[in-house]
């Protein structure tokens, strides 16, 4: 018997190693993952913005600042304003389906890789406000889908490639504030652009710069104006009247000259042209209780979106702390979003939908801002941060969350999610329930945040709505395997969040390997329960200031919520009732009986293979007592 157990243990270890190496291979063998890993290795990241770019996190589509389409192929890399330095890598050219490369406002140096010309699906290339040097690659002229090209405020040198004039889709061009030289093309797509696109390049020449190129004939000035001779009229004007009339005519001509010049420019150029200018400030309007802020108002509130005001970063964008003119503190979420025709109306519709989800345990949307270049959401500022920060990032001066507060958080967040599922029309699926997305107000009441953003983000193809996002440990099995989410996906995430509340630990933590423990919080908890070590899984910060029976009850709810089959998980409304003391004992007893029967069937089917255990099986052996 001992030999059997040893062999079974060895087989389980072998299977575990194979699964681990398989998951690593899936990420490392992914060409796109390799390319992004090369980029991360070549960049200096003082703020750990790229911390989630880990090969153990399934694939690049689960990493922050990366967006994928339905086929789990990278379509967007958003690393703007991230304080990154270092150089880009040629491997970026392997991201064949990439549409948006956002690297603006960093400290990146070196050349712009010519391999970016292989990104034939690229729509937007934003490299402005860096320290790039060298020429603009001629290969960028192969990007025939490019609409936005911003290379301004760098140290680029050499001529403007003529190949860029072949990009007929180009709508926004900014090459200003560089060290470019030579003639500015004025044919093809470049006929659309005005001098502002090329400003502050002292060695550029050509008609658009008002500086003739060497060897070219000077620009012909307009012919001088010769006033017609003054002919006395029959009525006779005095000399004073003639002089006054001449002065008036001259003044009129002086004021009309700019208008005439602009009219000449419009006749010379096509009627419609584009260039990058600061976004127009929207008029302040109210949609019910929802306020529409101007961009300028939010820029002032956040000190121009200063890094020092960043509260957090996520897959939807960055969150900034801000102070409005009346002194009110707010949290401003700056979304990353694809601009599509009709997107403004869609955005406003979805914003209004989110604003109608009003509940004590939901983060209330206070307002929004929409401009041609920005989408922002304004929320009340939550002084106590998130549950995750209170559990794992609290300063020594801050007391740990008491057990009673943790129970209050469990019930409040369940009520908020239940409202999203059962009382919103259409229902809202959160898709990313975890401790980091549960905020705490001044009274430590749980407030569910980031709901509705998956619908709000107006992407044609995005992992936010149809493919896996987030990190291992929070993701329901069916979501991980199919990319399809449901309200039961939220239930699973909620169950993991309960385990975070109880243990104070992360849902996925490689540091647990140091003690030969499971990296997945769910498996780690189950292992301790099977060994009847309940006291070892409770957060040490509680220092035994909890009731064991209440901990057992919360664990039971968590295990019911994290069953592998979504059909067997309770609805959030049922979870609320169980936490309120209604029906947990019956639900737990019923579930245990089903588990016993299922295991008996499995053992009869595999009489010599007692090692075949699903991660959700054999939980009756934990011998958790029922609610008391």
Swiss-Prot record:
Tissue: Expressed in flowers, tapetum, developing microspores, all cells of the embryo sac, provascular strands and developing vascular bundles. Low expression in adult vascular tissue.
Membrane-topology descriptor: Single-pass type I membrane protein
Binding positions for brassinolide per the UniProt entry: 64-65
TM segment ranges: 242-262
One cellular component term from this protein's GO annotations in UniProt: nucleus
UniProt gene name: SERK2
Catalytic residue list: 432
Disruption phenotype: No visible phenotype. Serk1 and serk2 double mutants are completely male sterile due to a failure in tapetum specification.
Ranges for region Leucine-rich repeat receptor-like protein kinase binding: 62-81, 100-105, 126-129, 148-150, 174-197
Known partners and oligomeric status: Homo- and heterodimer. Component of the SERK1 signaling complex, composed of KAPP, CDC48A, GRF6 or GRF7, SERK1, SERK2, SERK3/BAK1 and BRI1. Bind to BRI1 in a brassinolide-dependent manner. Heterodimer with PSKR1. Interacts with the EF-Tu receptor EFR and FLS2 in a specific ligand-induced manner. Interacts with ERECTA in a EPF2-induced manner. Interacts with ERL1 in a EPF1-induced manner. Interacts with TMM. In the presence of the signal peptide RGF1, interacts with RGI3/RGFR1 and RGI4/RGFR2/SKM2. Binds to the peptide CLE44 in the presence of TDR.
Region named CLE44 binding: 56-58
Modified residues (Phosphoserine): 386, 389, 481, 486, 604, 625
Classification lineage: Eukaryota, Viridiplantae, Streptophyta, Embryophyta, Tracheophyta
Keywords tagged on the record: ATP-binding, Cell membrane, Disulfide bond, Glycoprotein, Kinase, Leucine-rich repeat, Lipid-binding, Membrane, Nucleotide-binding, Phosphoprotein, Receptor, Repeat, Serine/threonine-protein kinase, Signal, Transferase, Transmembrane, Transmembrane helix
Main location (coarse class): membrane
Residues of the Protein kinase domain: 305-592
Superkingdom as given in the UniProt entry: Eukaryota
Signal peptide start and end residues: 1-29
Cytoplasmic compartment residues: 263-628
Record protein name field: Somatic embryogenesis receptor kinase 2
Modifications made to the protein after synthesis: Autophosphorylated.
Spans annotated as PSKR1 binding: 45-85
Record-level Gene Ontology MF annotations: ATP binding; lipid binding; protein serine kinase activity; protein serine/threonine kinase activity; receptor serine/threonine kinase binding; signaling receptor binding
Compartment annotation: Cell membrane
Family membership noted in the UniProt record: Belongs to the protein kinase superfamily. Ser/Thr protein kinase family.
Any one biological process term the GO annotation gives: microsporogenesis
Modified residues (Phosphotyrosine): 479
């Amino acid at each position: 018997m001992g030999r059997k157990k040893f062999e079974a243990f060895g087989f389980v270890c072998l299977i575990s190693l194979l699964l681990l190496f398989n998951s690593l291979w899936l990420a490392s063998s992914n060409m796109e993952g390799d390319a992004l890993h090369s980029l991360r290795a070549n960049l200096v990241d003082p703020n750990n913005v790229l911390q989630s770019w880990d090969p153990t996190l399934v694939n690049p589509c689960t990493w922050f600042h990366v967006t994928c389409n339905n086929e789990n192929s990278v379509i967007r890399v958003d690393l703007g304003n991230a304080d990154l330095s270092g150089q880009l890598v040629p491997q970026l050219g392997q991201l064949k389906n990439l549409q948006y490369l956002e690297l603006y406002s960093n400290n990146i140096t070196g050349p712009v890789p010519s391999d970016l010309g292989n990104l034939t699906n690229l729509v937007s290339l934003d490299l402005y406000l860096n320290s790039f040097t060298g020429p603009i690659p001629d290969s960028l002229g192969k990007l025939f889908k490019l609409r936005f090209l911003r290379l301004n405020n760098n140290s680029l040198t050499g001529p403007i490639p003529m190949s860029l004039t072949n990009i007929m889709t180009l709508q926004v061009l900014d090459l200003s504030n560089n060290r470019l030289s030579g003639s500015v093309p004025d044919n093809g797509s470049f006929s659309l652009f005005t001098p502002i696109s090329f400003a502050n390049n002292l060695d550029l020449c050509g008609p658009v710069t008002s500086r003739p190129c060497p060897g070219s004939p000077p620009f012909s000035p307009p012919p001088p104006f010769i006033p017609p001779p003054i002919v006395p009229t029959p009525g006779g004007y005095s000399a004073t009247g003639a002089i006054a009339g001449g002065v008036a005519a001259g003044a009129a001509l002086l004021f009309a000259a700019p208008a005439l010049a602009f009219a000449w420019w419009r006749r010379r150029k096509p009627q419609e042209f584009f260039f990058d200018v600061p976004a127009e400030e929207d008029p302040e309007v109210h949609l019910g209780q929802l306020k529409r802020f101007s961009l300028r108002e939010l820029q002032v509130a956040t000190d121009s979106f200063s890094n020092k005001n960043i509260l957090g970063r996520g897959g939807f964008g960055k969150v900034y702390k801000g102070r409005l003119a009346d002194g009110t503190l707010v949290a401003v979420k700056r979304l990353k979003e694809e601009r599509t025709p009709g997107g403004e109306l869609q955005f406003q519709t979805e914003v209004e939908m989110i604003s109608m989800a009003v509940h004590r345990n939901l983060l209330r949307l206070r307002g929004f801002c929409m401009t041609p270049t920005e989408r922002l959401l304004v929320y009340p500022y939550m002084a106590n941060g998130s549950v995750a920060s209170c559990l794992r990032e609290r300063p020594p001066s801050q007391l740990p969350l008491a057990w009673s507060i943790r129970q209050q958080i469990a019930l409040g967040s369940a009520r908020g999610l239940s409202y999203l599922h059962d009382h919103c029309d259409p229902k809202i699926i959160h898709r990313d329930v975890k401790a980091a997305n549960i905020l705490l107000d001044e009274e430590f009441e749980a407030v569910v945040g980031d709901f509705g953003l998956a619908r709000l983000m107006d992407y044609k193809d995005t992992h936010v709505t149809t493919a896996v996002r987030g990190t291992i440990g929070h993701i329901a099995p069916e979501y991980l395997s199919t990319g399809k989410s449901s309200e039961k996906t939220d239930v699973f995430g909620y169950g993991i969040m309960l385990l975070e509340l109880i243990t104070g630990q992360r849902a996925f933590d490689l540091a647990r390997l140091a003690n030969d423990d499971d990296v997945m919080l769910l498996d780690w908890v189950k292992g301790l329960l099977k060994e009847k070590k309940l006291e070892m899984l409770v957060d040490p910060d509680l220092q035994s200031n909890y009731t064991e029976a209440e901990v057992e009850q919360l664990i039971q709810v968590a295990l019911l919520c994290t069953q592998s089959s979504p059909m067997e998980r309770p609805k959030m409304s049922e979870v609320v009732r169980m936490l309120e003391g209604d029906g947990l004992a019956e639900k737990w007893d019923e579930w245990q009986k089903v588990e016993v029967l299922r295991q008996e069937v499995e053992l009869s089917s595999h009489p010599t293979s007692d090692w075949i255990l699903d991660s959700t099986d054999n939980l009756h052996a934990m011998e958790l007592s029922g609610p008391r």
